[in-house]
């Protein structure tokens, strides 16, 4: 009897943890689809504005020095990095761009110090994003290691 109760408790803990994890993941996706999130282009409400912001930001010089989680980065003029999700945001419109900086390694990365890398992720399928990301990659010395 005791074993059955213990098994039920363990089983219910697993499902409770699974529900908590699902809620966390859902919150991350919801946040990413907000106006200033990296996936704002997936939200019909912001799609057109995001595409226009990408075109506009692509034309700007990449010369703004900022600090992000202990690393100095150079990004496009009149943009900032969203502290919650790490994606770039256009200051003029408030739209999030599908270019995200990570404080961990990625295919396109930069070594900061021994065993510490920063990465950049971007959606190259969206017109203008590849061009903009390449400017930022070049300005910051990121290297693609996953060709």
What are these regions (language model features)?
Residues 89-123:
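A short acidic-to-branched-hydrophobic micro-motif
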């Amino acid at each position: 009897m005791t074993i059955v109760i213990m098994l039920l408790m363990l089983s219910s803990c697993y499902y409770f943890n699974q529900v908590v994890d699902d809620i966390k993941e859902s919150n991350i996706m919801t946040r990413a689809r907000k106006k200033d999130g990296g996936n704002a282009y997936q939200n019909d409400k912001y799609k057109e504005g995001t595409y226009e912001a990408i075109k506009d930001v692509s034309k700007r010089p990449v010369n703004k020095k900022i600090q992000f989680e202990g690393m100095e980065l150079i990004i496009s003029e009149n943009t900032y990095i969203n502290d919650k999700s790490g994606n770039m945001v256009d200051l003029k419109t408030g739209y999030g761009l599908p270019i995200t900086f990570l404080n961990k390694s990625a295919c396109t990365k930069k070594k900061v110090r021994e065993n510490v890398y920063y990465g950049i992720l971007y959606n190259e399928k969206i017109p203008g994003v590849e061009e903009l990301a390449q400017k930022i990659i070049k300005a910051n010395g990121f290297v693609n290691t996953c060709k």
